[in-house]
Amino acid sequence: MRVRASVKTLCRNCKVVRRRGVVRVICTDPRHKQRQG
């Protein structure tokens, strides 16, 4: 899980999702998981 100021999709499987006001990137590649912090 990466924590970043700006989350971006890294590949075509990445999706930007808002959960409880937190912006996240979910992907089939676990290295692409991100969270805005």
Swiss-Prot record:
The superkingdom of the source organism is: Bacteria
- Cite the Pfam families for this sequence: Ribosomal_L36
Q: Name one GO cellular component term.
A: cytoplasm
- Give the disulfide map: none
A single GO BP: translation
Q: Which UniProt keywords apply?
A: Ribonucleoprotein, Ribosomal protein
User: Listed GO molecular functions?
Assistant: structural constituent of ribosome
Q: Which family does it belong to?
A: Belongs to the bacterial ribosomal protein bL36 family.
Please name the NCBIfam families in this protein's record. rpmJ_bact
Q: What is this protein called?
A: Large ribosomal subunit protein bL36A
Organism (species): Methylobacillus flagellatus (strain ATCC 51484 / DSM 6875 / VKM B-1610 / KT)
